[in-house]
Amino acid sequence: FELPSYKVRYGNSLTLSMFLQGPRLIATYRKELKEVDRIVKEWQPDVIISDNRFGARHKDTHNIYLTHQLNIQHKKKSIALFANLLHRRFIHRFDECWIPDNKERDLSGRLSDNSEIRIPCKCIGALSRIKLSLEDPTIELLVLLSGPEPSRTQFEESIISNESLSQKIVCIVRGTDSKRLKNYPANFTIHNIVDQEELTSFINTSAAILCRSGYSTIMDLQDYDRPKYYIPTKGQTEQEYLAEYHDGKKGVKVLKNGQNI
């Protein structure tokens, strides 16, 4: 089954982006509820585990909401307050909440503070498809591109124009099948989309990694004890918080677009 995509786009202002996209997101949420209702009537499941999808629940099932973001962070307290009130309104329609982090919440920090959540919550540990077994490096820098457009392409452009990488063995995983940019340096190896086995191999044979500070990536790299460079997506307050929270821990260094490595 494939539920409708929210197709969220992030601009420089998260607040403005969400406001402009609000009507479309609400319409998608309603479609999601209808599709889940159809699936439940056809297959009659007992439990639904929803990965951050507000509409993936049903009155006839036990509904589990999976998220690490129970306490949205924003520089403006009024915006954080409103966002959290709205988010909790949706969360409380579920029966319980699972948090993909350890009991100490070392990965999510304040994001997973559940003190205001009225349904049962439990930490289930980090979720990752990557099995780390570090080997002698053959890649000096592995670049993992991700996220919505246009920020993904802007990130890619900043990497290929970074003069500090001109003498390094660089491997880029673009994370998309979209048309490649022109004029990649000769010392760059480019891959569009790779499978789990290939990605694991690249990570295990890299001397350092440059990527966004998305939570899925942070979970994948939690035991990677070589240098990790995070560049948060501008306007994504979650990534900005996570980058700041992890900066200086376990080999993490936060950079700005275009900054030398």
Where are these regions (language model features)?
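Conserved nucleotide-sugar phosphate-binding/catalytic loop shared by glycosyltransferases and other
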Residues: F1-G22, I190
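A donor-sugar binding/catalytic signature common to diverse glycosyltransferases
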Residues: E198-Y241
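Alpha-helix C-terminal capping/helix-to-coil transition sites in glycosyltransferase folds
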Residues: E42-Q44, R93, E140, N204-T205, ...
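Short acidic-hydrophobic, aromatic-tinged amphipathic segments that line or gate anion-handling sites
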Residues: F1, K122-G125, I190-I193, V252-N260
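Donor-nucleotide binding loops and adjacent catalytic segments primarily
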Residues: S112-D113, K122-A208, I218
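Conserved nucleotide-sugar donor-binding subdomain of glycosyltransferases
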Residues: S13-G55
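Active-site-proximal region of nucleotide-activated glycan assembly enzymes
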Residues: K59-C123
